[in-house]
């Protein structure tokens, strides 16, 4: 039998999706599963964007009759619309500094492929989004983590810790802001300190900013694209998935003012031919979504966040920090092993015919032991379901055999 590649075998499982077969089996047994494991919003997708997508799809047979490839960098009118969007957020770029991608994940993979050599190191605060590790391994690059602490709400670690981690193989620093999995939001002052290191050691600065719209309690988002003197260093990843509750559109983008990075990334863009045309049509229409939509969405997420934080912190032995952005947080649990506990919830437990699905935090750390007693949870379902999910968690911890305190 032909053998699987060594690289393929080394790829990590998704901390977010690896327990899906157990959730599917629970549903087959008639158990209702509350999904707090995945950032799939239940917020309504903007109707105006869906309507425009539908109208263009319906008129395609009469107007042209062919669903063509787009330009490999994306439809020009969409890239212009993205420039207008970024300008409103204080970021000035041109269409020829944007490559539209199949979700933000492809943008990440493109940048890693273009910028990283085997053995190069990327410094990332942890816990961190599990897919970063997958794409780093595909490039034979190494992630070097800087631990943050749940007691501080996973605030950005001291900049001195970053500098101590820099070696001759360090090629980049990566941040996610607002952050998944922690919900933390880095300030302008913190980003300026990171920028200082990037300049001092001539590094790339990779920035995942897909949760830009989701900042709470008066906190404001500051983009790394607004940092001066880093035109050749910064590569931004973005996506329509969470911003417009349109994960299935599979459209994102890579943005950079580094013309050399852009030119080489275009080789990859051409090799994969083009991003999804219907997704781009949706994305262009969604750029015109009124601010009232985001105001209502933000209000809803704040209410959901508060339910999660208050509810989890009332459970004996649990701790949930207060997220400043996105719709995730990592919680501390009185358990022996988060992988075993999260699987047990799906295989051996139900409360009145329901259970809750969490993402074990072991997959968000370079050293799984650091996440052994933690889980990432999302607040992407309605408040009534969140309350029911928290009740399931509370009852589960009363009977879990591996409870530690």
Predicted regions mapped to residue ranges:
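Helix C-cap/helix->beta junction micro-motif
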Residues: 26-29, 139, 200-201
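Conserved PLP-anchoring active-site segment centered on the Schiff-base-forming lysine
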Residues: 114-136
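Active-site PLP attachment segment
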Residues: 226-263
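Structural signature of PLP-dependent enzymes
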Residues: 263-269, 286-309
